[in-house]
Amino acid sequence: MGRRPARCYRYCKNKPYPKSRFCRGVPDAKIRIFDLGRKKAKVDEFPLCGHMVSDEYEQLSSEALEAARICANKYMVKSCGKDGFHIRVRLHPFHVIRINKMLSCAGADRLQTGMRGAFGKPQGTVARVHIGQVIMSIRTKLQNKEHVIEALRRAKFKFPGRQKIHISKKWGFTKFNADEFEDMVAEKRLIPDGCGVKYIPNRGPLDKWRALHS
C-alpha cells in the first residue's frame, strides 16, 4: 500500500502530536538538511535576505519541505554558484500523522473490525505552519535579488495553499535593519559572529565598554 496523499493531512484539525515515549515507531522525516549553500559565510557577505511566508494555517509534509529545498537549491546553484548564497528551511516537521489501515481485498470484513479501535499507526511527519510564518529564507548578495525571488517562486509550487515572497528590510538573517546595520557595526554596538551578530547594549560594566572601544 502506497503513501496516502498529503491533501488528506493538509489542515490543522488536531492538537500537536509529537514523537514521544507514548508515540513510538515514527518513521524518519524525509528532510534531513535544513541549511544549504555557503553556511559559514560571514554576516557582512550576504546582506540581502528573501523569505517565503505562509498565508494559511496548515500542515506541510516533510516530503514537501524536502522537495522545495532541493528545488530552490538547484536554481540558486545554477544562477549564483554554489558559494553565492545560504538557504535555511525555517520549519521542522515535529507533528506525527497517523493512518488507520483498511484492507480492501475480498473477505476483508471477516479480518478487520472497521472503525472499532480506529486510532491509527504513525505514518509520517508534518510541520504545522501559521499565517505570516516564514517557511524558507535565502540570504545572498544584493545583485542576486531577482534570482532569490525566482528560486522561492519555484519552491512555492511544492506546497499546498498560498505563500508570499517577501524581501526583508533586515540585514541577512539578523534582526537589525539593513540601513542601520553598518553604522551599528562601525560604532561597535554590533559584533559580527558567524552568520549572526552579537548586540552590545548601552548599559553594563564600564570596564567592559572601555575594553571594547579602546
From Swiss-Prot:
Q: Name one GO cellular component term.
A: cytoplasmic side of rough endoplasmic reticulum membrane
Glycyl lysine isopeptide (Lys-Gly) (interchain with G-Cter in ubiquitin) crosslink - at what positions?
Answer: K188
For biological process, the GO terms are: embryonic brain development; liver regeneration; negative regulation of apoptotic process; negative regulation of transcription by RNA polymerase II; regulation of translation; translation
Task: Say yes or no: keyword Ubl conjugation present.
Answer: yes
The record describes its post-translational modification as: Citrullinated by PADI4. Ufmylated by UFL1.
User: Which parts of the sequence carry Citrulline?
Assistant: R32
InterPro entries per the UniProt record, alphabetical: Ribosomal_uL16 (IPR047873), Ribosomal_uL16_CS_euk_arc (IPR018255), Ribosomal_uL16_dom (IPR016180), Ribosomal_uL16_euk_arch (IPR001197), Ribosomal_uL16_sf (IPR036920)
Task: Describe the subunit structure.
Answer: Component of the large ribosomal subunit. Mature ribosomes consist of a small (40S) and a large (60S) subunit. The 40S subunit contains about 33 different proteins and 1 molecule of RNA (18S). The 60S subunit contains about 49 different proteins and 3 molecules of RNA (28S, 5.8S and 5S).
Main function = Component of the large ribosomal subunit. Plays a role in the formation of actively translating ribosomes. May play a role in the embryonic brain development.
Question: What family does the Swiss-Prot or TrEMBL record give for this protein?
Answer: Belongs to the universal ribosomal protein uL16 family.
Please name the NCBIfam families in this protein's record: PRK04199.1-4, uL16_euk_arch
Q: How is this protein named in the record? A: Large ribosomal subunit protein uL16
Which species expresses this protein natively? Rattus norvegicus
